[in-house]
Amino acid sequence: MLIVLLIAASVFLFEGDMPAAQVDAKYSNAESKFLIMENGARVHYRDQGQEGGMPVVLVHGAMASLHTWEPWVEILGQRYRVITLDLPAHGLTGAVPSGEYGAEAFTQTIDAVANEVGLDTFVLGGNSMGGGATWRYALEHPQRVTAMVLVDSVPPASWQGESEDSESRRSGPVAFSLLRQGWFRAIAGALDPAPLIGQGLRAAYNDSPVVTEALVDRYYELIMRDGTRAAILGRTDSYSNADTKMPDLSVLTQPTLVIWGAQDSVIPVSAAAAFETALPNVRTVIFDDLGHIPMEEDPQRTAAEVVSFLEAL
């Protein structure tokens, strides 16, 4: 019976991929650049702001893209050089030939972009999954990361049982819960994700007015880009099978700014306190009225904290 229902759902809600060229034309711009990694991955990145300024590399979260940082690029770019990138399975990078979408692939992608733009050292920051990619990269390449900015960051897997609360799990994006279910992953590659995207964005952005039709369309069309849905499932499987051993974040002595929205429905604000305990050189800023994507919900206030942090380095 379950198999019949899965087949019926796949047929009724089926939606084919969008051509990559069509999506790329809409969501690239004059600042967009592409590099080809040794593993064949074509990585989309942008190098903006002040050419001679302190370099700041920013990494987006799950289901997002480098576009999430554009409000900060506009502000930080007045003083700093700001590099943003699309991770594998996301944005205009999308599916990669190797089919590798785990934490190590993210580390390699960040490293490749940093090398491509000629950075020896840089400030590294990330939101949500990109925050996890940030501290993982710093653990592997501590000599390259001069400071970190963690924005509602994914914590180590071994913390999650301590930091999750039932209310946030109920009110967060439904798609994240469904992607943990094997039955859903079996059909998700063919389903039209439109209803889940709308609900997920409203939850993640704390019902912010920045969730416009254009923003919903961008998320939808980037996810529907040829091969990306299958790549997202590959990323989900990679993280489901990830090593859950406890990393020693105390070795990360770089100055670190932790920013959190207290209304985060994806990763509860209690995780900010856990980072504050684990990291030896940390400053924490909590925004009581913001959610999981504070850099888009209120770019001016959040970027001001980043500028203050960077000025003190």
Annotate each predicted stretch with a short phrase.
Residues 48-92:
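Conserved HGGG/HGGXW glycine-rich cap/lid loop of the alpha/beta-hydrolase fold
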Residues 139, 149-185:
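Flexible "cap/lid" loop of the alpha/beta hydrolase fold
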